[in-house]
């Protein structure tokens, strides 16, 4: 909405929209408008807090694209019992991704000083120190262009198979028309 531009530059939007979209029922459950530059994960965490007000205690799985995940976000969701599937960037948990020996594997992520440093002196940093490690299920999915995408989840193999996780994640692409 709205735009601001300088001479000889492309117009830029002046607000940013963050929303949680129900891919099964094709409806927005939570949304917020913000200034253009905002912390999407912090906003998502606030929206996740409000989901029970919107849908009651119906179980749900949050599906997020690259750019959202962070160790504190994963811990926050796991502490709240929120199930998630998140696409990782190749730079997220790089050591763990490169050492995956299977396409679907439970991985222990050590929360060492290098991972905590950025959060030092915060509640997130203290929680990371307290836990010492987290476990995430990492799933490698081959893409048509012969590259790999890696998903991280706290859903067990008993709850969802590798193929079901892949199908659930790709349902996320149905929201792209609303974000264009």
Regions found by a protein language model. Name each.
Residues 1-2:
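Active-site- or DNA-interface-adjacent structural scaffold in DNA-acting proteins
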Residues 9-180:
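Single, function-defining residue in the core of a domain
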